[in-house]
Amino acid sequence: MAIVKCKPTSAGRRHVVKIVNPELHKGKPYAPLLDTKSKTGGRNNYGRITTRHIGGGHKQHYRLIDFKRNKLDIPAVVERLEYDPNRSANIALVLYKDGERRYILAPKGLSVGDQIQAGINSPIKVGNSLPMRNIPVGSTVHNVELKPGKGGQIARSAGAYVQIIAREGNYVTLRLRSGEMRKVLAECVATIGEVGNSEHMLRVLGKAGANRWRGIRPTVRGTAMNPVDHPHGGGEGRNFGKHPVTPWGVQTKGKKTRHNKRTDKYIVRRRGK
């Protein structure tokens, strides 16, 4: 994997930094594992904007990823690594011994030809998936379930991982990248290793148009608006003279946004500042 800084042949190329991975498959994706992906433009079924700054962008096919890893005790071989436009991580196409193919998240260190397996008796090896009850304390894992059988929900983006720091009764304690420590049922399944493509954070888009390709529209500052459009709007200067708020008047600096009190008891320590 190489980090390439583009030559300043134009204003739009001057600051571009690309991540080039020669190991990625250059052909088309595996068609049976593709699905349609329709654009919403940030609108709901009423046609009202529910998420701002979304619209346009290149068309994409959704890749059906196996987050559950529920094909147990059947070895699989990595056929190829692929780019996925729907996530920051790369994905791997694996061929199971019974002939079925699936996409999985590509962990760091996984190469074409490697053998992986899911199941309670799988060895502790990068890419293998098994219940956290059977994973040694101190191990680094990704694609971690919050509920048994629901599929991985934690640590799925590029470079993400979680560390198992304790096992007590029916629960294991995890340390997340944010610094949060939380308990999860030991029967939940996780995959050994960390997600690959950790250099993703080093890329620089270099121009506004690159964000438009991704379907992200411009974000206008509230202080640049009129009073009718935003609480920060209006006035003769740039100072809006109040605590920062959203367009709907809700505090925006440090206000807690978590509402699921039912699972608060599983959080041992809140994330660090």
Swiss-Prot record:
The keyword Transferase does not apply. Pfam families: Ribosomal_L2 (PF00181), Ribosomal_L2_C (PF03947). SUPFAM superfamilies: Nucleic acid-binding proteins, Translation proteins SH3-like domain. Residues 221-262 are annotated as: Disordered. Gene3D superfamilies: 2.30.30.30, Nucleic acid-binding proteins, Ribosomal protein L2, domain 3. Residues 253-262 have a biased composition (Basic residues). GO terms for cellular component: cytosolic large ribosomal subunit. Keywords: Ribonucleoprotein, Ribosomal protein, RNA-binding, rRNA-binding. GO terms for molecular function: RNA binding; rRNA binding; structural constituent of ribosome; transferase activity. The keyword Ribosomal protein applies. GO terms for biological process: cytoplasmic translation. Part of the 50S ribosomal subunit. Forms a bridge to the 30S subunit in the 70S ribosome. Belongs to the universal ribosomal protein uL2 family. PANTHER family: LARGE RIBOSOMAL SUBUNIT PROTEIN UL2M (PTHR13691:SF5), RIBOSOMAL PROTEIN L2 (PTHR13691). One of the primary rRNA binding proteins. Required for association of the 30S and 50S subunits to form the 70S ribosome, for tRNA binding and peptide bond formation. It has been suggested to have peptidyltransferase activity; this is somewhat controversial. Makes several contacts with the 16S rRNA in the 70S ribosome. This is Large ribosomal subunit protein uL2. The gene is rplB.
